[in-house]
Amino acid sequence: MTDKLKFKTSLLNKVPPPPPKSNQPSPSTSTPASPNVNSTNNSPSVSPATTSPIPSPGMSPLLTPENNNNNTNIPHQTSLLNNSISNKSSVSFLNNSGGNTINKSSPLSQSSSNIKNGGPIRTSTTLAQFSGSSLPNTENSSPPPSSSLISSSSSPTAESLLYSEDSIASGGTVTVDPNTKNGNIYNGNGLRNNSADILPHNNHTYCVGDDGFYLFGGTLPDGSYTNDFYTFQFAIKAWTILTFGSAPSIRTRHTGVLYNNSMYIFGGYSPSGPKNDIYVFSFDTQTWSEVQTEGTKPSPRYGHTAVVESGHMIVFGGISCDQTTKQQTVNNDIFSLNLDTKQWSQVLSTCPPSPRTHHTATMHKGNMYVFGGQDQQSNQVEDIVHCYTWASNSWKSIQFEGSSMTPRSDHSAVLFQDSIFISGGSSKSQTSQNLEIYEYDLYQKKCFKISSSTIVQNRISHSSVVKGNSILFWGGCTDNSFDYFSFGKDEFEEDYQDDYESNRVQNIPKELWEASLMKKHPEILELREKTLAFTGSKSFAKTLATPSFSENRLALSHQFVLQLIMEYLERNTYHKVIAAIQKESGVLHQPTESGESRLVSLLRLVKPRLRNKNVFDTDLSLFSKEEGNDPEVAVVDHLYHDYRHFDEEEDINVWEEGEDNNRNIRKVETDNNKVQIKAATFNKLIHYLAPKEKAFDPNFLKVFLYTHSSFTTSEKLLKKLIQRYQVPNSNANEPKYKSEVVEPVRQRVVDVLKYWVDKCPWDFNAGPTSSVLVATLNNFIDGSLTRDGNSNIKKLRELKKKLQHEDVRPYSEPPPEPKVPKNIFSPQLTLAHIDELEIARQMTLVESKLFGAIPPPEFMVRVIGYGEFQYNMATSPNLMTFVNRATDVSRWIVHTVLNESRDKKNKMKMLDKFIKTTECLRQLNNFQTLHSVLQGLQHPLLLSRPDLFTPRHREIIADHEMLFSKIDNYKLYREALARSQPACVPWIDIIREDFAQIERDQPSNMNNLINFTKRQNLYEILSKIGHYQFPYNLQIVHQVATFVNKLPKYSEYDLNLLSESLQSQVNSPLAGVYQPSLIGTTGSSSSINLGSARELNNSNRDSNNITGSSSNNNSNSSNSLSPIVKL
């Protein structure tokens, strides 16, 4: 690292050697020699290119609709390459929709052939440049002194780039070109780790993150379109294909922008024509989702550009298609999408540039710079640079001095500090097959041509990204490797190592930064210890070594904690997890000498100290008052922060909040002329929750109380309401002030409390702080309300008592008569004796009760460390219980069918019973259990026995699969759910997905204000859930409910073990003799043995790890759900 810094310092003070003379051969041999191309290729041909639905570089952008679906007889890439080299007077064009490849020329096609190293010509693209994506920026906006020897561009200073007069005077004979800069272009041999895993792409979109380079879609060498999603990891120098959820459809010539750690894909061309849909990929949740937008959306288009500025995606130009006349039009319009509100709008600006496509647009400090492109007649536009200013909504043309870049299209542009680098592309005037690079210095308004002693082949419709002090080029040619450009020597390998080390350090928690530094650099620790007398700081080594309350000889060591964990796992027979812990930690599990559990021993030790304490109290102090907090802990952990509350505003009294202004509230007027709150501070929301005015919005009250847990806690809300009730005194007219301010505000506060206790009781009767909340409410009722003689005291106390009783909503009519078997009271009652409808009813009662017990706060996604969205048992216990039952039902179905008597006929009967049960579940609108049973019926262990399924069975399963199909965002399921009666059990996966989409696409805060629009969207889902939680009018049959109430918990390992045992019985010499099942039950498994799961656990289990999440290492199925559900 030190050598690297020394080199970069010397680079600015040394003059590089003169470049080789023009008659000398190039020293670079890394790139293959370009084939000789007949000079006739430079003359345009009049043959129209009518076979390609997407024009190749230089071809007309107009499409021929009748050829869009020609998808046969695609020649192999090798044959195209050979054909292109052997027939040098013509060029082979690929039909991008998959059609035939023929040798025809278009007006600009023949000059384009000079750019390729043989092989197929790539179609053009429009590459969106990303502003703010880890690109360096300078704060100093003042232009530098005008001098040919001083440059404020992204490259190093002119002394290290240009040949100065001093070098000439010292004997140099080189003629200085002030419009040329010298750099180095390298062929990325060191970056080809697994380049064979990815085909060359063009017309794709890309973005750069801290850890890698991401690309999506584009055109493949055979001319077909793709929706591949790849990442190139800088640290390991390897390509990886990403397959997350429902990716956008295949497309090319689309655009992509990076915003809020998400990649937005817009438009493009697909086999069905141009598109104007928009998808987003969240790098936090690693999922795709389609973005639903409002407003004036751009027409379907491709070949456009998109950039981001001030939270808006700005779309310019491109080719659109009239859906009626199929007429193709090149545009110069501008559309803006607010990425926070998802609102489209057309921007009407003055003096826009001529219509164009295949151009580039780059954003720099509020200005969008547009370079090159093609017009309606496929002619490359002038080389004038157009600049659009977002703040003033105006266009202007900029003339750059210095070198002149030839008009071109299908090039790439990238921002590097304060310069834009243009590379490659198709140009009429270009006769070389080498990659050309131009630098546009935005401060000096000067264009420099980049000269290099090494050459690489030209690229068209490629990517160019900044990494460190280099610019990487990928795609747009027959090779799938990287080339990269740098003003210094080839230090790319070292840069990657530094980046990897930087990312590793950034992943260390802040509280461990100091300890990690001391461990990695003992010389710093030694220096710190020697200077303690001067600095006065506490000894770091002493802090970590001296016994104290936090770390002492009696404290629990990590070995002891591991023993505690393994004791728990041993009691639950998780032997495989214990073996993994022992292997990883080197700590062997050993029983205590006394035979008593270590946990029991610990409880005996702490019992005298905790005497009258409840160990489950959330406010239990770790230390007694006389001990206090260990001061040494503060020294070590002074960098620690509680990230869960980093967005909390300062606790200001609600009455000290100022009047409405842009800093504390944002409003919007609705279609019916009503003012709606878009975002506000917490105090300002309390103002509108209990306003002084008589006008009161009941919908605002519902949204606030149902969703308040997403931006505050119930304790803080109650504290703010009490603050609002305590109206400060005023020196104004006392009677008028009391009647117009004091009494209305207090009445509104009491009304809010009544609605909260009555309609949202979950905050008071569930959760770790519910007792504190109830105690605070009691104090308020017995204190302020009683003292003021409020008339609502009685009503509030009645509602508070109601919290202790379950709210039962009876039906006016009796439930339907249950279908009980004749031997209902027989000890030999099995599942085979029970009617399918009654099985479905009892399962529905269980699922409905579990679903009805989920309070709304548990549905809202919780954000834990590193921005990952998760549900877990700590924050959503009822929801997780409901989700985990889906896994239990699916595996119970599989186990019950497999463990049926070895007679194939009985297995088919049991399978038939479950399939008929699915039809009954569908009639009962129990979609959750229906999906769980369907997952069990589609388990690989059952699908491996196709002889058990009849054609009728397959037909019923196919109908259910269609119901849960992802087509049109689960359209069939959503329509079926809308037609359901109030009593239904929805499919929980769709509810979680709807919540997750809102969390991904809508920020929680807007300019330090609570995004209340997001809470309104959350409430729309929560209000529907409330209707679904209506109980069923069904009667419990206890004998039947025994079979489906508490299902045994089987793991994938258990199911595989059962399958293997059954297979071994079939192959054994005693196959004709009845043998008991290895699972612990005998005879038919329809007679459910609820203890069989515990007996089964004597085998090594892999379904749960220490944290309780399912790993299913031995499973080939993807149908299982984890107790921690990642969205």
From Swiss-Prot:
One of its GO terms (cellular component) is macropinosome. Kelch repeats lie at residues 212-261, 262-311, 313-366, 367-418, 420-469. Residues 835-1062 form the Ras-GEF domain. GO terms for molecular function: guanyl-nucleotide exchange factor activity. Residues 673-804 form the N-terminal Ras-GEF domain. Induction: Down-regulated by Pseudomonas aeruginosa, PAO1 strain and PA14 strain infection and by phagocytic stimuli. Residues 557-589 form the LisH domain. Keywords: Guanine-nucleotide releasing factor, Kelch repeat, Repeat. Residues 122-132 have a biased composition (Polar residues). CDD domains: REM (cd06224). Residues 1-82, 96-154, 1090-1127 are annotated as: Disordered. Residues 23-53, 67-82, 133-154, 1103-1127 have a biased composition (Low complexity). Transmembrane segments: none annotated. The keyword Repeat applies. InterPro entries: Beta-prop_ATRN-MKLN-like, Kelch-typ_b-propeller, Kelch_1, LisH, Ras-like_Gua-exchang_fac_N, Ras_GEF_dom_sf, RASGEF_cat_dom, RASGEF_cat_dom_sf. The keyword Ligase does not apply. It holds the Pfam family Beta-prop_ATRN-LZTR1. GO terms for biological process: macropinocytosis; Ras protein signal transduction. Promotes the exchange of Ras-bound GDP by GTP. This is Ras guanine nucleotide exchange factor F. It comes from Dictyostelium discoideum (Social amoeba).
